[in-house]
UniProtKB/Swiss-Prot annotation:
GO biological process, one term: regulation of DNA-templated transcription
Main EC class the enzyme belongs to: hydrolase
Pfam families: Helicase_C (PF00271), RapA_C (PF12137), SNF2-rel_dom (PF00176), Tudor_1_RapA (PF18339), Tudor_RapA (PF18337)
Keywords for the protein's UniProt record, in alphabetical order: Activator, ATP-binding, DNA-binding, Helicase, Hydrolase, Nucleotide-binding, Transcription, Transcription regulation
Name of the protein in its database record: RNA polymerase-associated protein RapA
Physiological role: Transcription regulator that activates transcription by stimulating RNA polymerase (RNAP) recycling in case of stress conditions such as supercoiled DNA or high salt concentrations. Probably acts by releasing the RNAP, when it is trapped or immobilized on tightly supercoiled DNA. Does not activate transcription on linear DNA. Probably not involved in DNA repair.
InterPro entries, per the entry: Helicase_ATP-bd, Helicase_C-like, Helicase_RapA, P-loop_NTPase, RapA_C, SNF2-like_sf, SNF2/RAD54-like_C, SNF2_N
Domain Helicase ATP-binding stretches: 164-332
SUPFAM superfamilies, per the entry: P-loop containing nucleoside triphosphate hydrolases
Sequence ranges assigned to domain Helicase C-terminal in this UniProt record: 473-627
C-alpha cells in the first residue's frame, strides 16, 4: 500500500540521515517536498519510491520539544494523519506534544533497533563503517580540504590565492596573474573549495564563447565538477520553468547572454552565490558610457554576493581599465576615477621602498621617510628594528604595508619574474621554398597564411594531388620526426582540416604513429587521442592539434612544439606555446617553426620574432602592439615595399621595448608579495606532497571496493581497472561508468594520462562511496568471538561507537571545529571502559566471525542484560562529547575574534574591507556557537564480543 503523506508529518531520510528530522511541506502530483529545518535543506522525492522512514515514537521513548524540554511518551494519537504524543515532562506534569513541534535535532538509535531485530552484519562492514567515520573526520579538519584533490601539480602561489580567497565569506576579488600562471586553476580551486565547504552552493561562470569548451574540460578533468554548458539551443530546449535553476554550476557564453533578454531574466531569477567572469578585461567601460556586456556583469555583481574576475594584468590594461574592473567588485570604494589615480600614485613610493628593502636588505633615508608617512609613529619602532638588522621586524614591516595596500585584498597579480620556475625557450626556424601551386591562389583573408586550406577548397584534386604531396613543410615535418625518433612532439596548426590532412600524410608517407585532436571530436575521443599520445611505450610519437582543439589541455610531458603555421594574433601564439611552457616543465621548450619564403608566413614570423619577441619570451605587450600596428600590419603581410615593412618592424620593436621598460619600472613588489603568499603557499605544497605519499587512501578504497563488490585488477604501474562484479551490492555506487573505469592514485600519472580517474579523498567516487557507507545501516551491528587467554570464556564485552556531531548548514563551516567524530567505548561486564587500553585495530586482530543465526540467538537471549549496558555507554561517552563541544566553541570564538580584530583594524587603514564582511562574520560566529550548543551524540554502531 502506498504511503499517505500529510503536511506537517515528520520523516527521516534513509540516505541522508545527517539532514535531521524532516517535515512534509507538500505533495504535488508525483512529487513530495520535504524540508529539513536543522540544515535549511529542501528535498524533492518521487512519490512512489521516496527513501523516507516515518518517525513514530512508542510509549517509553523520551522525545524533545523544539524549545528543548523533554517528555516521556505514554500514549500516541493519530489525528487526521498527524501524530500527537501524550506523556510526562521532567517535572512529572502531563503534557502534549504534536509531532509538528518535535525538535529538529532528535537522533535515532537505529543500531539498537537492528541489533535486537536480528540484522547483524559482517565484521568487515563494521570495520569499514568505523574507518569511514575516522577518515571523514580527519578530512573535514584538514587545511588541504578542497586544495589537494585537483589534477594539477601543487603550485605555491595558486594554493595561497585559492585558500586566501575561498576562505572568505562571499569573496570579491580580481585575479590578474600574467599568462601561464594558472588563473583558471586558481578560480577552479576557489570554486571547488567553496562548494566543498558550503560557502557557495550555486556558481555562475561567464566566459567568451570561444573559451566555453576550455572551461568545461578544465572543470571536469581537473576538479571533477559537472558544469552545465548553456547556449541558446539548450536554453530553448529545456522543459524547466527556469533552466538555470536545474543546475548547480552554469557555464554561460557572454555573447549569447547579452543578446537574449529572456535568458537574462531567468539568470537573475535563479539566484547565485558566486559569479566567475573570465577575460573580464574585454568588458568595455568609460566614464561616459559602458558597453552592454559591462553593464550586464555590473547588474549581476550587484545581486550576487561573491564575484571573481579573471583578467589581464593591471599594467596591460592601463589604469582606467583596471579601475573599471575594481568598481565591479566594490562600487562604493571605487567610485571616482580621479581619486583612484591619485591614490595609486601615493602607493607607488611605498612599493619602491619595499623593492629597496628586498633588493638591498636595508632602507635609504628617503625610503624610511616614505614608510613613516604611510605608517605614522607606530611604524617607527619597526623601522628602528629593521635598521638594526632584525629579519623578523623586516617581515612584519612588509606585512603591515601589505595590509594597508590600496587594492591588496581585492587584487591578486603574480608575475613570471616573481614566481620563477619557467623553462627556457629555444627557437628553430626553417625557411622553405614556396611551391608554385600556392603562388597561383587568389588573395583572400589570411589565404596566404594558410594556403593549404585555400588550395584544398579551390581544388577537386584527386588523392594524388592533395596539398600535402607538394607542400615542403610536410616533407620537413617527416624528416624532423624521424630525426627526433621516439621523442614526443606536439604539432599545432590553425585549422581542423589541416590537422586531419597531416595525420593522413604521416600515415601514407611515413608510417610514423600519429594521432589528431580537433574541435570536431567529442571529449571522449579527445581523451583517447591524448592518452595514445601520452603512452610512453606504445603511444603516438606526434599529436596534431587544431587551434581550438588544444584549448584547456596540458601536454607538458612533451617539450618539442612544431608550429606548422602561425596564428593571426599574438595571444593565440602565446596560447599555443603555453600548452608546453608551464610551471613544472622540466625541459627547455624547443620551438620548431617552418614557413614558406617570400610569403605572408615569412613576414608574420618576422613580426612575431623581431618586433614582438614572442617566441623566446612571453609577450605581455602583444595585445597593445597588435591593436596599435594591426591596421598597417595586415596589408603589408600580403604585399608591400621591403623598406616600409622594415620600418614597421623597427617602430614596433622600439615601442615594445618602451612598454616593457614601463612595465618593469611599474612592478609592484608589494602586490607580488601579497599575491605570492610569502612562504604560505610553499607550506601547502609540502603538505599536499606528503599527503600524496601516504597509503591510507588506497588501503581504505580496497576495503570499500571489496564491500560493494567492485572488482579491481592491475592496468599498469600505478593504475587499476575497476569493474562492477556480478555480486555488486549497490548499483548506485559512483563508479562513473557501468562498463568500468581506470584509476590511479599517482598525481604524475594522472597528469600525463587524462583518460584515468585521479583518485583523492575529494574525488566523487571516494566521497560518494563514503556517503553510501554512512547513509546506510550496513555495518552498524556485529557479533564476534574474541580469542584472548586473559578473558574468561563466556565473558561479554560491548563495543559502542558513537558519533559526536553538529547538524547545521554547511555554510557555517562547523565541520572545521566539530567534524563528525567516532567516539569509542569498550565496556566490560563491570561497566568499565577499556577503549583507552585496547585500540580498535588491536581488538580487531583478536576477533572471529560468528554465524548470523547463532549470533541472533545469543543476542535475543542476552537482550535484557545488553539493554541497560547500552544505555550506560552514553553516560561514559557524554563527558568526551561535552569536551569536544567546549573545545569547538572555544576555537570558533577565538578564530572569529582574531579575524574580526584583524579586519576591524585593517578597515581603519584600508577601505577595501567591506562592512558587510564584518557583519557576516559576526553573524556566522553567533549562529555557529548557537548550533554547537545543540551538538548531539548518536549511537552509530554496536559490536557484541563473546570470549571463547
Amino acid at each position: 500500500m502506498a504511503q499517505q503523506y500529510q503536511p506537517g508529518q515528520r520523516w527521516i531520510s534513509d540516505s541522508e540521515a545527517e539532514l535531521g528530522l524532516g517535515t512534509v511541506l507538500a505533495q504535488d502530483g508525483r512529487l513530495l517536498t520535504v524540508l529539513y529545518p536543522a540544515t535549511g535543506e529542501t528535498r524533492q522525492y518521487a512519490l512512489r519510491n521516496a527513501p523516507l522512514t516515518r518517525v513514530r515514537f512508542s510509549p517509553g521513548d523520551v522525545i524533545t520539544h523544539f524549545e528543548n524540554w523533554k517528555m516521556t511518551v505514554r500514549e500516541v494519537d493519530d489525528v487526521d494523519g498527524l501524530l500527537v504524543y501524550h506523556g510526562l515532562n521532567a517535572q512529572n506534569e502531563v503534557v502534549t506534544l504534536p509531532e509538528t513541534q518535535l525538535s529538529n535535532f532528535i537522533q535515532f538509535r537505529l543500531a539498537t533497533d537492528r541489533l535486537f531485530a536480528g540484522q547483524i552484519d559482517q565484521l568487515s562492514w563494521f570495520s569499514l563503517r568505523y574507518n569511514t567515520l575516522e577518515h571523514t573526520s580527519r578530512q573535514l579538519q584538514s587545511s588541504l580540504w578542497g586544495l589537494g584533490g585537483v589534477r594539477a601539480q601543487p603550485i605555491a602561489h595558486q594554493l595561497h590565492i585559492a585558500r586566501e580567497v575561498a576562505d572568505r565569506i562571499a569573496p570579491r576579488v580580481l585575479l590578474a596573474d600574467e599568462v601561464g600562471l594558472g588563473k583558471t586553476i586558481e578560480a577552479g580551486l576557489v570554486i571547488h573549495r567553496q562548494l566543498l565547504s558550503g560557502r557557495a552552493n550555486r556558481v555562475l561562470i561567464l566566459v567568451p564563447e570561444n573559451l566555453q569548451h576550455q572551461w568545461l574540460v578544465e572543470m571536469r578533468r581537473r576538479f571533477n565538477l559537472q558544469v552545465a554548458l548553456f547556449d541558446a539551443e539548450r536554453f530553448m530546449e529545456s522543459d524547466a520553468g527556469n533552466p538555470f535553476e536545474d543546475t548547480q554550476l552554469a557555464l554561460v557564453a557572454l555573447e549569447w547572454l547579452v543578446e537574449d533578454e529572456k535568458a537574462q531574466d531567468a539568470l537573475f531569477a535563479a539566484g547565485w552565490d558566486l559569479m566567475v567572469v573570465d577575460e573580464a578585461h574585454h568588458l568595455v567601460w568609460h566614464e561616459e558610457k559602458a558597453s552592454r556586456e559591462y553593464s550586464l556583469v555590473e547588474q549581476l555583481a550587484e545581486v550576487i554576493a561573491g564575484v571573481l574576475l579573471l583578467t589581464a594584468t593591471p599594467e596591460q590594461l592601463g589604469q582606467d581599465s583596471h579601475f573599471a574592473r575594481l568598481r565591479l567588485l566594490d562600487p562604493n570604494r571605487f567610485h571616482d576615477l580621479k581619486a583612484f589615480r591619485a591614490e595609486s600614485e601615493n602607493y607607488r613610493p611605498v612599493a619602491q621602498a619595499v623593492q629597496e628593502l628586498l633588493d638591498k636588505g636595508k632602507l635609504s633615508a628617503a625610503a624610511q621617510k616614505t614608510i613613516h608617512g604611510f605608517l605614522g609613529a607606530e611604524g617607527d619602532t619597526l623601522l628602528a628594528a629593521v635598521n638594526a638588522g632584525d629579519d623578523e621586524a623586516k617581515a612584519r614591516l612588509i606585512r603591515e604595508l601589505l595590509d594597508r595596500h590600496g587594492t591588496g585584498r581585492v587584487l591578486f597579480r603574480n608575475t613570471r619574474a616573481a614566481v620563477q620556475g619557467f623553462p627556457e625557450r629555444k627557437l628553430h626556424q626553417y625557411p622553405l621554398p614556396c611551391p608554385v601551386e600556392y603562388l597561383e591562389l587568389p588573395v583572400g583573408e589570411h589565404a596566404d597564411l594558410y594556403p593549404e586550406v585555400s588550395f584544398q577548397s579551390q581544388s577537386d584534386a584527386s588523392e594524388e594531388e592533395r596539398w600535402w604531396r607538394f607542400d615542403p613543410r610536410v616533407e620537413w615535418l617527416i624528416d624532423t620526426l624521424k630525426m627526433l625518433k621516439r621523442v614526443k612532439v606536439l604539432v599545432i596548426c590553425a585549422h581542423a582540416e589541416t590537422a586531419m590532412d597531416l595525420e593522413d600524410a604521416l600515415r601514407v608517407r611515413s608510417g610514423i604513429p600519429a594521432t589528431v585532436f580537433h574541435e570536431g571530436m567529442n571529449i571522449l575521443e579527445r581523451d583517447r587521442a591524448a592518452a595514445y599520445f601520452a603512452d610512453e611505450e606504445f603511444g603516438a610519437q606526434v599529436l596534431i592539434c587544431s587551434e581550438i582543439g588544444s584549448e584547456g589541455r596540458n601536454f607538458q610531458f612533451s617539450h618539442h612544439l612544431v608550429l606548422f603555421d602561425l596564428p593571426s594574433h599574438p595571444d593565440l601564439l602565446e596560447q599555443r606555446i603555453g600548452r608546453l611552457d608551464r610551471i613544472g616543465q622540466k625541459h627547455v621548450i624547443e620551438l620548431h617553426v617552418p614557413f614558406l619564403e617570400t610569403s605572408p608566413q615569412a613576414r608574420l614570423f618576422q613580426w612575431y620574432h623581431e618586433a614582438l619577441n614572442a617566441f623566446l619570451n612571453t609577450c605581455p605587450t602583444g595585445n597593445a602592439l597588435q591593436h596599435q600596428f594591426g591596421p598597417r600590419l595586415l596589408p603589408l603581410l600580403e604585399s608591400g615595399d621591403d623598406d616600409e615593412w622594415q620600418s614597421l618592424i623597427d617602430e614596433a620593436r622600439s615601442e615594445r621595448e618602451r612598454l616593457e621598460s614601463e612595465l618593469h619600472t611599474g612592478r609592484d613588489r608589494l602586490l607580488e608579495l601579497n599575491s605570492g603568499g610569502a612562504g604560505e603557499g610553499e607550506a601547502l605544497v609540502e603538505d599536499i606532497l606528503e599527503q600524496d605519499d601516504q597509503f591510507s587512501l588506497p588501503i581504505y578504497m580496497e576495503t570499500l571496493f571489496d564491500a560493494f563488490g567492485i572488482d579491481s585488477e592491475d592496468h599498469s604501474e600505478n593504475a587499476l581497472i575497476l569493474k562492477p562484479s556480478e555480486k555488486m551490492l549497490d548499483a548506485s555506487f559512483p563508479l562513473g561508468d557501468d562498463e568500468g573505469v581506470t584509476i590511479t592514485y599517482d598525481r604524475n600519472q594522472a597528469l600525463s594520462r587524462e583518460d584515468m580517474q585521479f583518485i583523492t579523498w575529494e574525488h566523487p567516487m571516494v566521497q560518494g562511496g563514503m556517503d553510501l557507507v554512512l547513509s546506510g545501516s550496513m555495518g552498524n551491528t556485529a557479533v564476534a568471538l574474541i580469542k584472548n587467554k586473559a578473558l574468561k570464556p563466556g565473558t561479554v564485552l560491548l563495543e559502542l561507537i558513537y558519533v559526536s556531531e553538529v547538524v547545521a548548514p554547511r555554510s557555517l563551516q562547523l565541520g572545521r571545529y566539530l567534524p563528525p567524530a567516532a567516539l569509542r567505548c569498550l565496556l566490560d561486564a563491570n561497566g568499565n571502559d577499556l577503549s583507552s587500553r585496547v585500540s580498535f585495530n588491536t581488538l580487531n586482530d583478536q576477533l572471529e566471525s560468528v554465524p548470523r543465526a547463532s549470533a541472533n540467538k545469543f543476542i535475543q537471549a542476552q537482550r535484557d542484560q545488553l539493554t541497560p549496558r547500552i544505555n550506560a555507554g552514553e553516560e561514559k561517552i557524554t563527558p568526551k562529547h561535552a569536551e569536544r563541544v567546549a573545545e569547538a566553541q572555544r576555537r570558533l570564538a577565538a578564530d572569529t575574534e582574531e579575524e574580526l580584530a584583524r579586519l576591524t583594524a585593517l578597515q581603519a587603514v584600508n577601505p577595501t574591507v567591506r562592512d558587510s564582511e564584518l557583519v557576516a562574520l559576526r553573524t556566522q560566529r553567533e549562529q555557529g556557537l548557537a548550533m554547537l550548543e545543540k551538538a548531539a551524540l548518536r549511537l552509530e554502531a554496536i559490536r557484541v564480543l563473546v570470549a571463547g
